[in-house]
């Protein structure tokens, strides 16, 4: 029981630290729509796509690796709660176009990055 807990804890810690670092480095550049949250979500989308495709080709790999990367790292890196708070803040300030644009970029961008991650592994496997 300790292996899964440690895998998730390690992944979450690393993902959370990266998200925090991205926020520190990027959010001052454009505070109305903090880019750190967007970059964190896009990176997490790409990594989860790579992980899904990679783990599909590695069925004998210990399940703790999936927990570390997908549940832990990507879960700690991506941030729906911060995204939600930022969107609500934009709406409260009457910046409706910014809010709708941010929603579209976060959701579409994350989906595109997940597909790109899957495509990356598929491309490497076929090369």
From Swiss-Prot:
InterPro entries per record: FluC (IPR003691)
TM segment ranges: 4-24, 36-56, 68-88, 98-118
UniProt cross-references to Pfam families, sorted A to Z: CRCB (PF02537)
GO cellular component: plasma membrane
Keyword list, A-Z: Cell inner membrane, Cell membrane, Ion channel, Ion transport, Membrane, Metal-binding, Sodium, Transmembrane, Transmembrane helix, Transport
Positions contributing to Na(+) binding: 75, 78
GO MF terms held by the record: fluoride channel activity; metal ion binding
Catalytic activity: fluoride(in) = fluoride(out)
Notes on how activity is controlled: Na(+) is not transported, but it plays an essential structural role and its presence is essential for fluoride channel function.
Topology class, membrane: Multi-pass membrane protein
Disulphides: none
Localisation per UniProt entry: Cell inner membrane
Keyword Transport: yes
Keyword Cell membrane: yes
GO biological process, one term: cellular detoxification of fluoride
Known function: Fluoride-specific ion channel. Important for reducing fluoride concentration in the cell, thus reducing its toxicity.
Family (UniProt): Belongs to the fluoride channel Fluc/FEX (TC 1.A.43) family.
Protein name: Fluoride-specific ion channel FluC
Organism per entry: Nitrosomonas europaea (strain ATCC 19718 / CIP 103999 / KCTC 2705 / NBRC 14298)
Origin organism lineage: Bacteria, Pseudomonadati, Pseudomonadota, Betaproteobacteria, Nitrosomonadales
Annotated gene: fluC
């Amino acid at each position: 029981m300790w292996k899964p807990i440690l895998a998730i804890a390690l992944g979450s810690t690393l993902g959370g630290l990266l998200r925090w670092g991205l926020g520190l480095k990027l959010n001052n550049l454009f505070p109305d729509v903090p880019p750190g949250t967007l970059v964190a979500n896009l990176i997490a989308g790409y990594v989860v796509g790579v992980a899904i495709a990679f783990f599909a080709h590695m069925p004998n790999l210990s399940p703790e690796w999936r927990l570390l990367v997908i549940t832990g790292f990507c879960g700690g890196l991506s941030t729906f709660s911060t995204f939600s708070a930022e969107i609500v803040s934009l709406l409260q300030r009457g910046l409706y176009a910014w809010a709708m644009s941010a929603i579209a970029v976060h959701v579409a961008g994350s989906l595109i990055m997940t597909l790109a991650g899957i495509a990356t592994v598929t491309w490497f496997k076929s090369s």
